[in-house]
Amino acid sequence: MSVHTTDAKPDSEVDRLLDGLNPQQRQAVVHEGSPLLIVAGAGSGKTTVLARRIAYLIAARSVGVSQILAITFTNKAAAEMRERVARLVGDHTGPSMWVSTFHSTCVRILRNQASLIGGLNSNFSIYDVDDSRSLLQMIGQDMGLDIKRYSPRLMANAISNLKNELIDAESAVANLSSDTDDLARTVATVYGEYQRRLRTANALDFDDLIGETVGILQAFPQIAEHYRRRFRHVLVDEYQDTNHAQYVLVRELVGHGARNSPDDMPPGELCVVGDADQSIYAFRGSTISNIEDFERDYPDTTTILLEQNYRSTQNILSAANSVIARNFGRRDKRLWTDAGKGELIVGYVSDNEHDEAKFIADEIDALVGGGEITYDDVAVLYRANNLSRSLEEVFIPTGIPYKVVGGFCFYESKEIRDLIAYLRVLDNPGDAVSMRRILNTPRRGIGDRAEACVSVYAENTGTSFADALQAVAEGKVPMLNTRSVKAIAGFVALLDDLRCRVDDDLGELVESVLERSGYLRELESSTDPQELARLDNLNELVSFAHEFSTEQANAAALAKSLHTPEDEDVPDTGALAAFLEKVSLMSDTDQIPENNSGVVTLMTLHAAKGLEFPVVFVTGWEDGMLPHMRTLGDPTELSEERRLAYVGITRARQRLYLSRAITRSSWGQPILNPESRFLREIPPELIDWRRSILTDSYSTPASGASRFGRVRPSSIRSGASKRALLVLAPGDRVTHDKYGLGRVEEVSGVGESAISLIDFGSSGRIKLMHNHAPVTKL
């Protein structure tokens, strides 16, 4: 492969790349040689540093753009990185410089190396979570499994966990032993069948994209060497969020510890950026030890700390520093800014979640009405998706425009998934999940029995579902009645006709699918208002397809005008395959409204990672909510919850609101929650409490509440001598005035001498006498 280098720029241009950087940022940009770990605190300018480092490689060190691989965690971050680099060095990087997510990077490698994986070719489909679950549903039914006990969701999560650890189906079976439980045995069996059907469908799931790429690099040294020679500079953003498979992928691409290397080529330059204090995706398989142990894995590492914050005021940063400092074993790091203290954090204790939502709505109205901000300056963050309901119930009648990020996505709607399934079948006829989805959509007289017969025929003859349909159309499957055969023959002819149009403009192809399949006609003939909304969504997809075709053509023309060589590591799969790939790799963060959208953003704390807003409301500061109830007994999980609180606080630029509800509905019942232990960790002088005592409606004196509004109802807290004897049992949920929320583990004794061992999370496991402890049963 030819390597295209860029002539070094004059010193003045190089100096421009370093303008405005603080000493630590400058050191990170110009570093050469040894692996580089940039520990970048929230808002410390890591994106600026990464973009400047890439530009510096090109302009000052004459590194060819094709020798650079930059990996991000979201499409949005990748697009921003490309734009920043283009502004710094000119828009001549073309397709040769890879700036993309882990999954997109691996797709590009796999498209070119698919022939090395048995049963796969370069136009493979990418199964998302719903596709995987649909396939697992089929497998479960065919294997006669109890779907309630072994649900597709459970099986998908278990298989995903194995793949993230690079454990293949054969190894999962080999690892079984005599004392292995039924679930693990079932997972191993289903895993093998799942992989077999994926190959038959010429498909990979999300986890396969990483795992199969690692497999190729490890099994074929010459391929690994090819990519190591190409990518002499590898940069990885958000390294604290990598899982084991991604960790191994990076090592293979760089060449550290490479096995079977054909020669002694030195490893590539590796630069990773991350912050262990913002590691919040353990539930997705991320491994915080990847960044914590980086200096051990790469002994000659240079480590640079970025602690100067360019986003938030000092009051906000001081609150964040105080919370995260309680995590044990972390790298000492304190964020600071020279932007001044700023306004105090606003605290609010509400009676319930509806009062909390009304307070937030009133504050937003006041700020917008006063001309201080616009709606798109505001984000409301919460620990769990269900907390958006009360906000929406208040925002709608109030007239506050909003968008829920991570809620129901455009690409998850039935009509869009139906149309995408048609397109996927045209691109990859072996995609059985998509084929079976559209077989009778819209209704064309192919019932469940006919579909089952086709499936059985495919299984018995060892052919794909598509080949089985063709056999039916040719009259080779006698078990079907004439009506079903005719309907299936018509469906096969429809696909053949549409397949002749795949080289048309993508927007025109989508229109052809809608019209010729009868899908559009069925919706237009309906009087259901919901069907009209589906039409609007389909019109939007048609527009997007036209735009995508135009963008593809413009990009090709630009590359040609700049004489940018085509990237030989990326085969031209055509506009349809590129479009399907883009849709498949969409993530929640791609739904985030633009800055000028004119809407308030509602999202979970997890989804807010990497974002910032002038005004941020973080709701639900209660033990049981933040931290979440299920984490209270596990110090490791509680540490991650504290990191989540830290992430929420550091999203705010100028104004930060922290609110909690005294009672919050759960399963239709009001639940009394104490204030979050994290809230108690913020210095009181940083918070301006707009409301911190109970309303008269609770009939509780003000002296019965702490500065955070902790409830001490007279009916419960009127003194041990006057209250009913507390009766507890293992598993009961309690709150203690000092230790917060906990769960009862053991109870000994009876009556007034009863003693409970209670797990209070980070406060420890404590024995308390029922008759004297300030404990309330929830």
Curated annotation (Swiss-Prot):
Needed co-factor(s): Mg(2+)
Q: Where is the UvrD-like helicase ATP-binding domain?
A: 19-313
Domain of life, per UniProt, equals: Bacteria
Q: Where is the UvrD-like helicase C-terminal domain?
A: 314-610
Per the UniProt record, which EC number(s) apply here? 5.6.2.4
* Entry-linked SUPFAM superfamilies: P-loop containing nucleoside triphosphate hydrolases (SSF52540)
Reaction(s) the record says it catalyses: Couples ATP hydrolysis with the unwinding of duplex DNA by translocating in the 3'-5' direction; ATP + H2O = ADP + phosphate + H(+)
According to its UniProt entry, the protein's GO biological process terms are:
recombinational repair
Role summary: DNA-dependent ATPase, acting on dsDNA with a 3'-ssDNA tail, unwinding with 3'-to 5'-polarity. Also highly efficient on nicked DNA. Involved in the post-incision events of nucleotide excision repair.
Name of the protein this chain belongs to: ATP-dependent DNA helicase UvrD1
Give the species this sequence originates from. Mycobacterium leprae (strain TN)
Gene for this protein?
A: uvrD
